[in-house]
Amino acid sequence: MQRTAEAVSIGHPDKTADYISSYILDRIIEQDPNARYAVEVMIKDNTVVLGGEVTTSALLGDLATHVKNALSEIGYDERYATIWGKFAIDPAQIKVINMIGVQSADIAQGVDHDGWGDQGVFVGYACQGEGKINRELFLARKLNKALYEKARQSDNLGIDIKTQITLNDDKIETAIVAIPMLSDEDLTEFVISVLGEKPAHIIINGTGRYTYHGSIADCGITGRKLACDFYSTACPIGGGSPWTKDASKADLTLNVYARILACENLADNDECFVYLSSCIGRNELPSGLIKTIKNGIVSYRDLWCNQKPSTLIKAYGLDKPIYAKLCDKSISGIQN
């Protein structure tokens, strides 16, 4: 049976957008751990649009500086712009359009009383194996991270990287890599060394050339790489994007909680699925279910876990400036 998973680097414009939003949230939380934050980002060429709602006592400061600092952390800095020229974003030319307002009073009246910021259904997953995620996703991420770190040190390779792994049963059938190159570079042996085995097929830059990249080649928008952020095809995706929100938002905190519960309840099962739901303005969870699979036998157990947002926020340190790091790591990169 063939199984395929994809991974993308934070140099990909969609993930760059996620990272910028998460970075700005970190700067706000440093001043105001109780801030309410929901900011979407669009990045195209050298223009960044920020739109959403923020309620905080923090001073936002110069948003353009925050955006440039986030880009620099990713690797889009002055050195990178000098090497790549017209082929990549230039942080010195960044223009920021600010369309940020304040949170709706209708939402605030529930959230301020320790209620969830939205309704929704949330899914957590864990399985046996490295990272407690499906092997094809683990390998796609491992290869992506290795290529990204290599590119950060290179004068020839770019950081907008996509990797895709197809397993046939448990053997690596195909490894696909898209990575910007100023001149051709054979990465075959590097791919094999990272994966620990030789795939039947290795495809690097399938179009033959890949130079224009990042927001110069592709418009990036927050929340568009959820299959990569979550569990690929191993299970349904719950809620919406977690990356543009503070911890009062169920899309973030209950997806984190569902993943942790799945890891905790995996035990000696082959797979564990956790399903949670929320109601806006209420602090109890309307429903919860744990499904486990072991040797083909499926078991179900109701889960009663009326966890308030404040309880989970404190337990997982979600009132700390950890969001950019979490965005890079992904929800399914969490194990405890």
Name these PLM-found stretches:
Residues V8, H12-A17, D114-G129, T211-C235, ...:
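Conserved phosphate/anionic-ligand binding catalytic regions in large, soluble enzymes, centered on
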Residues S9-H12, C127-N134, M181-D186, S241-L252:
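Short histidine-centered catalytic/ligand-binding loop motif
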